[in-house]
Structures are given as structure tokens and as C-alpha cells.
Design a protein with these regions (language model features):
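Acidic beta-to-alpha connecting loop that harbors the catalytic carboxylate
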Residues: 154, 183, 461
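Thiamine diphosphate
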Residues: 1-146, 301-525, 530-532, 589, ...
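Short beta-strand/turn micro-motifs composed of small residues
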Residues: 151-152, 180, 375, 432, ...
Length: 670
């Protein structure tokens, strides 16, 4: 156990660096970082297990920061362990710096997750804890790590905390320890203005082990973490009553603590000078690490070296006795796509693509032992039950199953799956109705930003949901999610792969693309209703190019008909009528516009040559295909919310028939 005077000095060092970073940047959040310094210092100097030489070590503990605005605290702490330089800290929030305004995932520097939107970070931790339990059930104690999370008042207020708290308690995630920085201050007000709930009782009701402490007292923090580590049945919440802006002083030397003004702005001028003096820093040169703090972390580095050496030795001994599991461990954490025998997938002709997806999922459940599939209480409708039928639910005390029942909580489910991907070793997929993807959008964006290969399964893809009516008909959703295909990630690639297959066989190809895509998230959009198969002889492998000419198309064509999903078969019906009038037709299936636009220009031109008349059909907004059709033609799409009626009636009323395709193309060619 370290001397408390040194521990307090180290926490003050973090406070100094955090406040100085924000002051120099003229932007940021110093108050929370100053209040949380005692906890994060205690965690990193005495408890968190990681390998300083191998930051990607799969057996490391994980620390998930929820309030990304407290980046100065995390950067300062990571500076103390050598992951950042003092010069890096000086460049907070600047162009090209490694210290952006909110932390961005970088394992080499000790940052496990990108954080910013409150509530998501601690839910990632719940997902990571599930992944760790899942892997431990298959590999044993070689994966015996602890997942730590840090949450703020704002994160607790976010609705997603309900789902995260419920799931963690229900599953008994005793490997999860969360510190709640309860400083009672937020950006605009004191928390008492917006909430009077008893947070401790709430988490206890969810099945958590809850402790209340002084969040700035080293002894109490230390004891609380030890108690949490001993817990064997419940996740732990440590409610630390912290002082916002601890150590801050006003220009006249009076206290500036517990003041909303310190939350989201630099301390400023003489306030900053007096704060630095109060904390024992040189206001003219605050970017320093005190000698005793350097010694503290040098000792911890030696301790970690010994701890990690013992863990590696245990792993080596385990590998000798469990060669198959050792091989799995290496394969699951290597970042490569799993090997799958796709010939095992036998599709039923004319099936709904959600049903075709179930067929694929049943094979994946058998062939990909590190895959977890989830559903938000819709497994028998979104057909993720194809996976479930080959495994069983993950439940408290038994993580040998591979199906995660998230309950009616789409955003929570998505964030948990992101957390699984962040932990590593697990391939997560989650399903719900396409219309409910609206609930998931913030998480999908974070998955894309972090370049995580989560598979999002969205069914009931258009107005053909039918009788349920406009509340359940995602008319505008395809256009929205395909914007993610146009948005580039920081590696210059499409931030997301979005696929909407035309029939059962194309569904298999789309799932193959999803499973081979280990660089970005994938959206798989499936139909509720049955869909006719594309013409015999169709080369479905061409779907990997995003768009391709469907078999049976005429060589010397007069018009190109293009669509994705179930609309392709409607185009085929219209094509039969057009050919009776002597019109030659090329039909193009476009499961992924983003992927198609990533192909060489020569290929794009060969499929959709400029100057040729084009007709697009989409069950969504016309804008979904307007970029591909351009000035060469027109798009038939839905420009209003949907309606309640049997889907075949809606097809007739809304013009999604072969006859209407025939009539619209005739007008185009007139």
C-alpha cells in the first residue's frame, strides 16, 4: 500500500495537469477531472492490471470512461504511466494532436473506448464484462480480468443507464466495477434541480452491490475497490461523493470548488494562477510530473512487470494442457475473419430475406464458436432465432450460451455489442426491426467511428410491414443509414457497410461480406415478406461489388432498371411486360451503393453506363437511388409515411407492381 501523502500528491498532479491542459487550450472541462483524480490515481497505481510493454494483451483489465469530457483526467493519468508526453498534453484539442477533446480509442495509449455521448461508455463496459464471462466459460481463468467503468451524474441520468444497470444486475456481472463520480454538479445546474432519485437504491434494486464513499479519500477508495473485487455474485457500484473542481481557487484565494462554472470552461486568469499555487504547482510551468509521483509509478511498473510475468507463465502452462483452447484464444483475438464453410448454407427458394438470414445464422452458430447474437425481444420475428435454436441464452451463472437477450432496449443492446467488440475475442451481432434502428443510431455512429465489426441485423425493412402501419414502416430509414456508406472514417474508408439483399441467395453473399468485414460495422437489411428468386443462372458472387447486372438481362438494352432488396423482383416482373413490347432491359441489383462506388470507375460505368436511360425503384425515399440514376431517368419511391393494410394491398395502392414498373418505364422512354 502506498503512502497516502504520495497518493494525494499524485492526485494533485493530475488536477494540475488537467486544469493546465484546459487553460492552454482555452477550451475543455477541468472541474470533473479535478474531482475524479483521486479515484483514477488509486485505480492505476494500485489495482489496474495491464502490460506496459504489450498494451493489447488480451488478459488485461479494461477501464472504460463514460464522460468523455473528462478527457483531461484520463490523459493526465496516462501521462503518469508513460502513454503520453507532457508535450502531448499541451496540445489538447489541437489539430493533429493525439489528445482530442474527447478520448478516441487507441489501445497502444491505454484508451479502450471512444467516449463522448454520455451513457454509452459504461454500457460498453457492461458488454465487455459479458464478453469476458463468455470467454471465461470457454477458455477458463486465463481470461480472468476485471472490467472497470467510470460514470458521472450525466451518465446516470441518460436513459441508457436503465438498460445497462438492469442487464448487468440480471446477469450478475461480478467482474464489473463501476465508479460513480457523484459530484452533484452538471453543466447548467446542480443535480438537485433535475433529479431527487436515490441512485443507490435504484442500483440495489437492479441487483448491484453498492458502496457509498468519500470519492476524494484514498483510504475509502482503496477499501471500496477491495470490497468490490471480493464480490462474487453482483456487479459493483462505488458511489464516490467527489468535489467538483477540487483544489480550485478564485482570484482572491477563496474556494472555487463545487461551482458549475468549473464544469465546462477554463478556470481562467487569476483563478488558474491561484489554483496552481494552492495545488503546489508553478503557474508559469504547470506541465510537470513531481519526482515523488514519478517514483510512485516507477514502483507500480515494477509490480506490473512481476504480475504480468506470472500471468504469462500461467497462460503458457494452461496452453500446454489445453492446446485447442490456446489455439482458439489466438485465433479469436487476431482480428481476422473466421473461417466459414459457406457451402453448408442451403437456402429455401422464395424465402423472406429475414428467413434466409436465419438459415445463415444457424450455420454461423455451429461454425463460429466466439460469436454472440442478440435481439431486443424480437428473436422469433427478426429471425435471430435461427442462431438461438443452435445454442441457448446467456444467463446469470451460465455463460456457456451464445445468445444475448437484451430485452426491449435497442440502444442498450447495441452498446453492449459494441462493448463486446471493444473487449475483443468476440464477434457480436444484434437484431431488431428496421424502424427501431432509430433508437440505435447514436451507438451505430460510435461503432463506425471506432471502426468496430459489429453486425446490425434489421428486418421488416419497408412499408410491407403492412398491417402494423406507419409507426412500424421504416420508409426513410434506408436513406438515412446509407449516409453512413458515404461518410468516411479516419482511415479513408466507408464508415459502414450497408447491404440489402434481393433474395435468399443474395442474403448468403451479404452475410458473407458482413462476416469477412472486420474493419467497420455492417448493416444487414432484410424483408418481412417472401421474395421471388432472381433468374436462374444469376452470379450472386457479383454482389460483393455492391451492384451487378442480374442474369437474363438483355445485351443491347434500351433501359436499365435498378433496385435493392425485394424491389428487384418487382423489376423482373415489369421486365417481362416490357419485353412483350420489344423493349430490351438490363436489371441491376444494388445491395450496397457504398460498396459499388468503391469499385473502379470502369466497373461502375460497365454496370450503369452514363447516358443510358435508368429507372430506379425503392420502397423508401426516392433519394435512396437518385444518386445512381442521376439525370438519366427517374426513381419511383415512397414520399410519405406508410399506411396500415396487408402488404399486397399496399403494393397495389402505392405502385409497387410489375404493371406500374411497365407504365413508368414506358413514360420514361416516350
Amino acid at each position: 500500500m502506498n503512502d497516502n501523502k504520495v497518493m494525494n500528491r499524485a492526485a494533485d498532479n493530475i488536477r494540475i495537469l488537467a486544469a493546465a491542459m484546459v487553460e492552454k487550450a482555452k477550451s475543455g472541462h477541468p472541474g470533473g477531472a479535478m474531482g475524479g483524480a483521486d479515484f483514477i490515481n488509486t485505480l492505476y497505481s494500485e489495482f489496474l492490471v495491464y502490460d506496459p510493454e504489450n498494451p493489447a494483451w488480451e488478459g488485461r483489465d479494461r477501464f472504460f470512461l463514460d464522460p468523455g469530457h473528462m478527457a483531461p483526467m484520463l490523459y493526465s493519468q496516462l501521462c503518469l504511466i508513460g502513454k503520453y508526453t507532457l508535450e502531448d498534453l499541451k496540445q489538447l484539442r489541437q489539430w493533429g494532436s493525439v489528445t482530442p477533446g474527447h478520448p478516441e480509442r487507441e489501445i497502444a495509449r491505454g484508451i479502450e473506448n471512444t467516449s463522448g455521448p454520455l451513457g454509452q461508455g459504461h454500457t460498453f463496459a457492461v458488454g465487455a464484462a459479458i464478453a469476458a464471462k463468455f470467454l471465461k466459460a470457454r477458455l477458463g481463468n486465463v481470461m480472468n480480468q476485471t472490467i472497470y467503468a467510470y460514470i458521472s451524474d450525466g451518465g446516470v441520468q441518460e436513459e441508457i443507464s436503465q438498460g445497462a444497470g438492469r442487464i448487468a444486475g440480471n446477469l450478475g456481472l461480478d467482474n464489473l466495477i463501476m465508479f460513480y463520480d457523484a459530484n452533484d454538479i452538471q453543466l447548467s445546474t446542480k443535480t438537485e434541480v433535475v433529479t431527487t432519485e436515490d441512485t443507490a437504491k435504484k442500483y440495489e434494486a437492479w441487483g448491484w452491490y453498492v458502496q457509498k464513499i468519500n470519492g476524494n479519500d484514498v483510504d475509502q477508495i482503496r477499501e471500496a475497490i477491495k470490497n468490490a473485487q471480493k464480490e462474487t455474485e453482483r456487479p459493483s457500484l462505488i458511489i464516490g461523493h467527489c468535489v467538483m473542481g477540487k483544489g480550485a481557487r478564485k482570484a482572491d484565494g477563496s474556494s472555487y470548488e463545487c461551482n458549475c462554472a468549473t464544469h465546462g470552461a477554463p478556470l481562467g486568469g487569476d483563478n488558474f494562477v491561484q489554483t496552481m499555487k494552492n495545488l503546489g504547482a508553478d503557474p508559469e510551468n504547470p506541465f510537470q510530473i513531481f519526482p515523488e509521483v514519478q517514483d510512485l509509478y516507477a514502483r507500480r511498473a515494477k509490480e506490473l512487470k512481476q504480475i504480468v510475468a506470472e500471468r504469462y507463465a500461467q497462460k503458457a502452462e494452461w496452453a500446454k494442457g489445453h492446446p485447442e483452447q490456446a489455439k482458439q484464444l489466438e485465433e479469436w483475438f487476431c482480428g481476422k475473419a473466421p473461417v466459414i464453410d459457406w457451402l453448408k448454407v442451403e437456402q429455401k427458394a422464395g424465402a423472406a430475406t429475414r428467413g434466409a438470414s436465419a438459415t445463415v445464422l444457424s450455420v454461423l452458430a455451429e461454425q463460429v464458436p466466439n460469436m454472440i447474437c442478440a435481439s431486443a425481444d424480437l428473436s422469433n420475428s427478426d429471425k435471430t432465432d435461427g442462431f438461438l435454436k443452435k445454442t441457448h441464452d446467456i444467463v446469470r451463472g451460465d455463460f456457456s450460451g451464445a445468445f444475448f437477450q437484451a430485452g426491449v432496449a435497442e440502444l442498450t443492446m447495441a452498446c453492449c455489442c459494441i462493448g463486446m467488440a471493444l473487449h475483443g475475442g468476440v464477434i457480436p451481432a444484434c437484431g431488431t426491426f428496421f424502424v427501431f434502428s432509430d433508437y440505435m443510431k447514436p451507438a451505430v455512429r460510435m461503432a463506425a467511428l471506432m471502426e468496430l465489426p459489429v453486425k446490425f441485423i434489421w428486418t421488416h425493412d419497408a412499408f410491407r410491414v403492412g398491417e402494423d402501419g406507419p409507426t412500424h414502416e421504416p420508409v426513410e430509414r434506408e436513406a438515412q443509414i446509407r449516409l453512413m456508406e458515404k461518410l468516411k472514417n479516419h482511415h479513408g474508408k466507408n464508415s459502414m457497410l450497408v447491404v440489402r439483399p434481393a433474395d435468399a441467395e443474395e442474403t448468403t453473399v451479404c452475410w458473407r461480406m458482413a462476416m469477412e468485414n472486420m474493419e467497420t460495422p455492417t448493416a444487414l437489411i432484410f424483408s418481412r415478406q417472401n421474395i421471388d428468386m432472381l433468374p436462374a443462372g444469376n452470379d450472386y458472387s457479383q454482389a460483393t461489388k455492391g451492384a451487378y447486372v442480374v442474369a437474363g438481362s438483355d445485351e443491347d438494352f434500351d433501359v436499365i432498371l435498378l433496385a435493392s432488396g425485394s424491389e428487384v423482383s418487382t423489376l423482373e416482373a415489369g421486365t417481362e411486360l416490357l419485353r412483350k413490347d420489344g423493349i430490351k432491359v438490363r436489371v441491376v441489383s444494388v445491395p450496397s451503393e457504398g460498396l459499388f462506388r468503391s469499385q473502379p470507375k470502369e466497373y461502375q460505368e460497365s454496370v450503369l453506363p452514363a447516358g443510358k436511360k435508368k429507372f430506379g425503384l425503392t420502397a423508401g425515399l426516392p433519394v435512396t437511388l437518385e444518386g445512381l440514376v442521376g439525370a438519366d431517368g427517374c426513381v419511383w419511391g415512397l414520399q410519405s409515411f406508410g399506411f396500415s393494410a396487408p402488404y399486397k394491398v399496399l403494393d397495389e395502392k402505392l405502385g409497387y407492381t410489375g404493371q406500374n414498373v411497365y407504365e413508368q418505364v414506358k413514360k420514361l422512354l416516350a
